[in-house]
Amino acid sequence: VPYISDLNDMIRMETLKKDIVYQILYYLSDNDNYDDLMHTVIYGKPGSGKTEISKIIADINVNLGFLSKGHIKFAKRSDMIAEYLGQTAIKTQKLLNSCKGGCLIIDEAYSLGNSDKRDSYSKECIDVLNQFLTENKKDFMCIIIGYEEELQKCFFSHNPGLDRRFPWKYKIEPYGPKELLQIFNLLF
């Protein structure tokens, strides 16, 4: 399977690698009849490899044919939140529709909301996303990336059903000095 070697080449992360392979095997075991959500969360500190892991997961799922169009898009707050009230739902829906058959990766997903929940733009965006996650579960994958505490406070807390839309959750531990030296040696 393409991109499995990229996953395997990641320094350390042995448990994460096994869990991702388990996720792949889960979908391969009953590809035609699965009714489960593919949506995934990747938690980790800055520089821990969250974005790289999200790309690998998306590429694997695309190459296994789980997503009909096979495209991968990256988004951030400004791609989903509009300038004027009432426009955010339209902007978010347009982005999500363009991702059908593919994977949407939202980096720093906690920036879509805030901890005091007084941002109606955020609510609009997250409500549209939440509905889309369920209605398009068979041919759409969403991967969100961010810091665990911020995602809980500023993203998942905005909608009680949102957390269960992401059944696959991976936490990347920070690299230690030994791993950083390995990475440095690979680069130079």
Name each model feature, range by range.
Residues Y110-E149, S157-G161:
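Conserved catalytic/switch belt of AAA+ P-loop NTPases
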